[in-house]
């Protein structure tokens, strides 16, 4: 390192502590980057890569950005998942001896960004910290640096459960210890696309102990300690706005796994990953940024406590029924800025005068809001506003201190009102009168010289001057002015009198700017005292905003208040998919009932493609979520239980698990539901088994249906193209066939989008192909092939084999191999015996025929089957073993 110049040596020393970040190294008016940072930054930011002499034999790669434009470049890098260490000059270069002293003043990361275009005003920017313990449990702590919010929870489930909870936070960055499992880190980065950071310190930092007073569990304290230590190490500034840590328990909320949330498009669409077109987009009628953030948090964690849900519903009903109250509240909320993030900026010391003006305007609305809510005869409303302080003294302070139209910068003056500070008023008097004198001098000199174009101007280099065009120089009295500067078309002069006034004016103006800055920073410290009250107020206003948002959308879209029941029954009359209905924008939407009494657990749904099966299934899930976040629902009547979990497998999700096939994704999602669902869960399976051969798919579909029906008892919508499965209605007493109706008119299919009882009689696949405008010749050929296939043998679903519950694992009997042969009912067609296919694809002979002798290969496979311990295998392992044996039999 000694071969480099002292400045480059200094750079390398600082860089050694920030190997995983771009180092923005301040040199004068630029932030410079060197070596690999420069090469990579030039590529990512599309800026010029140059080089400089650094003392070594080879030139050093270098690139840089102007300091005043650095914010934009830093945002670009952080948006791409990088970290940026900002290294500033911490001493005056004019007085420095040797190399100017420099220090990193902040490490900016995806989870610690405070402002900029990467921070959506209606989304939290959570930083997560995950701690793994020897007993297999995890503690997850989260902090939103922009709002000061802190949460922590203990997780004891699988890695998938951990992923679900981290996903629910929306975190872009997660902090772990340096020994954290690499496999688990890979899942976080691949599935959730997160930036990984490391922090080994877990003790609560000095000065922050008061934030964990309500946290007693050592595991939770460790997770919070890791989080706080990382924040302090990276931010290096005041954290006065951090709020007390809130403990929450995941079993207090409905569980919806990561893939189900995406399938249902709760907060973003599958295709575009955008909010528009999601349920959140429809429900978001909030008027404040903080209300928008709370709405998203509620949607990520629907409630499962009936009483809490009903409290919200009653409050929404109050707003629905009182139009004037609702509209008045909305008008006031429009004037409320982001109190949470304003408080954060105050604490961080980067609040400006305009921010404080926004704070004052917000606080002016608060007394009327609190008074209106206090008049409601509602226990929830009374509890909500209890302890809310309108901060009227702060409103008064800001009202008499901050100008109505202050500049963005706090270093340019013109911030503080007249009358706030006596000394400032005196300086302003001198400055103002001095400028009046300058204007009078200009008029007097014009009169004396007769030069109408004479003017008095000012610049920072020469100060005040008298400017005369060259055409008028001859009119000047000789010796009146002292020449100061020559321009192309004019001459500039000064006088002793002008210089005297200039000194008085400039001294006053300099003192004004400095005093205003000092007064503003003192004011900012006074505002800091109110941060806890502002944060409490923000929570109250956010919650009111979400509730009025629910009321507004419910009124606009004609939603109804759901009735919650402790019974396991669903009664939805004229239910609609809220987002599809909205997107149709006035076109007729066909509503559908969903009526599942306590003794009805499974709807087996058949019908053609494009008929609306998936929409109907999603519709039920969205109605359920809306109900349990406290919103009215799209129906004319709704009676619903409180579900503990929602599981889905509904198309378009094949890319969600990296590197997995469609069929594997199906099986993994099916396994998740089967392993975790309870009788209080909702399961939505769309076309399970489509990713493999017909017989395998049908076998698995039947087995899954039977297992859910017999062993779980969850309310389930199961759509299928295997029409043969509809006979299960005869043997499963809590299963009912329903179908989406369609009719043919003039050889073309017309989808009615109406759910009706019974099984569908046709799939209309070729008609759908016609709608897609496939070539006529291809359609004609498909019809010929279909006619041939329909004339062939019929597939018969095997009878169920009753097995005791303890003998079953996840996939029930039709695919469980036993030593005794399974009797398969025979069907006769045209008085001829029809041979049937078993679930292994091997042809079974009619009972009237003698069983053929097994060859050596078949005997070997049978021996292997007998040795399989099915009770010690997962469904996926059983399926893989089945494929292996089948493949072995098929080899010639």
UniProtKB/Swiss-Prot annotation:
State the disulfide connectivity: none
Where do the annotations place ATP binding?
A: 607-614
Domain of life the protein comes from: Bacteria
GO BP annotations of the record are: mismatch repair
In its keyword annotation, does this UniProt entry include Magnesium?
no
* UniProt KW Amino-acid biosynthesis keyword: no
User: Pfam families given for it?
Assistant: MutS_I (PF01624), MutS_II (PF05188), MutS_III (PF05192), MutS_IV (PF05190), MutS_V (PF00488)
Q: What SMART domains does the annotation carry?
A: MUTSac, MUTSd
One function term, GO molecular function aspect: ATP-dependent DNA damage sensor activity
**Region spans: Disordered:** 833-855
Query: Which CDD domains does the UniProt record give?
Result: ABC_MutS1
Transmembrane spans: none
Q: Which PROSITE patterns match?
A: DNA_MISMATCH_REPAIR_2
GO cellular component terms, alphabetically, are: cytosol
The entry's family comment says:
Belongs to the DNA mismatch repair MutS family.
Q: What function does this protein fulfil?
A: This protein is involved in the repair of mismatches in DNA. It is possible that it carries out the mismatch recognition step. This protein has a weak ATPase activity.
Please state what the protein is called: DNA mismatch repair protein MutS
Question: Which lineage is the organism of this entry classified under, starting from the top rank?
Answer: Bacteria, Bacillati, Bacillota, Bacilli, Bacillales
């Amino acid at each position: 390192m000694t071969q480099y110049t002292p400045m480059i040596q200094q750079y390398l020393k600082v860089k050694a502590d920030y190997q995983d970040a771009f180092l923005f190294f301040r040199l004068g008016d630029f932030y410079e980057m060197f070596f690999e940072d420069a090469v990579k930054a030039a590529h990512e930011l599309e800026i010029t890569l140059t080089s400089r002499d650094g003392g070594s034999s080879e030139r050093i790669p270098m690139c840089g950005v102007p300091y005043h434009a650095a914010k934009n470049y830093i945002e670009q890098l952080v948006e791409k998942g990088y970290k940026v260490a900002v290294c500033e000059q911490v001493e005056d270069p004019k007085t420095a001896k040797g190399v100017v002293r420099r220090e990193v003043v902040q490490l900016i990361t995806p989870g610690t960004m405070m402002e900029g275009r990467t921070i959506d005003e209606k989304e939290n920017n959570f930083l997560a910290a995950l701690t793994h313990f020897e007993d297999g449990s995890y503690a997850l702590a989260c902090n939103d640096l922009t709002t000061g919010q802190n949460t922590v929870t203990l997780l004891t489930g699988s890695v998938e459960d951990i992923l679900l909870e981290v996903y629910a936070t929306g975190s872009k960055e997660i902090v772990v210890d340096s020994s954290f499992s690499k496999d688990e880190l890979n899942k976080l980065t691949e599935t959730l696309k997160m930036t990984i950071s490391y922090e080994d310190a877990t003790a609560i930092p000095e000065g922050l102990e008061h934030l964990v007073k309500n946290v007693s569990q050592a595991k939770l304290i460790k997770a919070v300690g890791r989080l706080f230590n990382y924040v302090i190490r990276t931010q290096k500034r005041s954290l006065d706005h951090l709020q007390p840590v809130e403990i929450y328990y995941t079993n207090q909320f409905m569980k919806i796994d990561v893939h189900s949330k995406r399938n249902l498009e709760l907060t973003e669409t599958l295709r575009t990953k955008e909010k528009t077109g999601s349920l959140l987009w429809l429900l978001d009628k909030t008027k404040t940024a903080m209300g928008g953030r709370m709405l998203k948090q509620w949607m990520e964690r629907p409630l499962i406590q009936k009483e809490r849900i009903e409290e919200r519903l009653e409050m929404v009903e109050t707003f629905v029924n009182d139009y004037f109250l609702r509209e008045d509240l909305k008008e006031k909320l429009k004037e409320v800025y982001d109190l949470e993030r304003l408080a954060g900026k105050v604490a961080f010391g980067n609040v400006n005068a305009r921010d404080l003006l926004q704070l004052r305007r917000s606080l002016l609305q608060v007394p009327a809001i609190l008074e209106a809510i206090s008049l409601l005869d509602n226990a929830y409303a009374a509890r909500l506003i209890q302890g809310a302080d309108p901060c009227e003294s702060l409103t008064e302070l800001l009202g008499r201190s901050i100008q109505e139209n202050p500049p963005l910068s706090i270093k340019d003056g013109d911030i503080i009102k007249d009358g706030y500070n006596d000394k400032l008023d005196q300086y302003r008097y001198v400055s103002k009168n001095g400028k009046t004198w300058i204007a009078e001098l200009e008029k007097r000199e014009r009169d004396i010289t007769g030069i109408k174009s004479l003017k008095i101007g000012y610049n920072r280099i020469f100060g005040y001057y008298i400017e005369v065009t060259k055409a008028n120089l001859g009119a000047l009295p000789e010796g009146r002015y002292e020449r100061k500067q020559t321009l192309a078309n004019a001459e500039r002069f000064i006088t002793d009198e002008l210089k005297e006034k200039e000194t008085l004016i400039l001294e006053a103006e300099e003192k004004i700017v400095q005093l205003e800055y000092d007064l503003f920073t003192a004011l900012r410290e006074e505002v800091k005292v109110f941060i806890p009250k502002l944060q409490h107020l923000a929570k109250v206003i956010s919650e009111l905003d979400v509730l009025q948002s629910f009321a507004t959308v419910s009124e606009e879209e004609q939603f109804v208040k759901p009735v919650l029941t402790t019974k396991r029954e669903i009664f939805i009359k004229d239910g609609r998919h809220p987002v599809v209905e909205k997107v149709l924008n006035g076109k007729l939407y066909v509503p559908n009932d969903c009526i599942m009494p306590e003794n009805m657990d499974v709807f087996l749904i058949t019908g053609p493609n494009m008929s609306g099966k998936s929409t109907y299934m999603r519709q039920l899930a969205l109605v359920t979520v809306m109900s349990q976040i406290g919103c009215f629902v799209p129906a004319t009547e709704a009676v619903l239980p409180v579900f503990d979990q929602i599981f889905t497998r509904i198309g378009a999700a094949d890319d969600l698990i990296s590197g997995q096939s469609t069929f594997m994704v199906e099986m993994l999602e099916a396994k998740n539901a089967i392993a975790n669902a309870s009788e209080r869960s909702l399961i939505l399976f769309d076309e399970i088994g489509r990713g493999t051969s017909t017989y395998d798919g049908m076998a698995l579909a039947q087995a899954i249906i039977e297992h859910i029906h017999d062993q779980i008892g969850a309310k389930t919508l199961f759509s299928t193209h295997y029409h043969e499965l509809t006979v299960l209605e005869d043997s499963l007493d809590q299963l009912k066939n329903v179908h989406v109706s369609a009719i043919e008119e003039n050889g073309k299919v017309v989808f009615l989008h109406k759910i009706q009882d019974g099984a569908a009689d046709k799939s209309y696949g070729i008609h759908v192909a016609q709608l897609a405008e496939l070539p006529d010749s291809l359609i004609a050929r498909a019809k010929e092939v279909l006619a041939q296939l329909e004339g062939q043998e019929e597939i018969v679903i095997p009878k169920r084999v009753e097995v005791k519950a303890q003998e079953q694992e996840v996939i029930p009997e039709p695919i469980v191999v036993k030593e005794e042969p399974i009797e398969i009912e025979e069907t006769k067609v045209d008085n001829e015996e029809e041979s049937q296919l078993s679930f292994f694809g091997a042809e079974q002979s009619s009972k009237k025929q003698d069983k053929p002798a097994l060859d050596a290969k078949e005997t070997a496979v049978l021996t292997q089957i007998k040795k399989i311990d099915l009770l010690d295998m997962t469904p996926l392992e059983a399926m893989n073993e089945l494929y292996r044996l089948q493949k072995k039999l098929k080899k010639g």
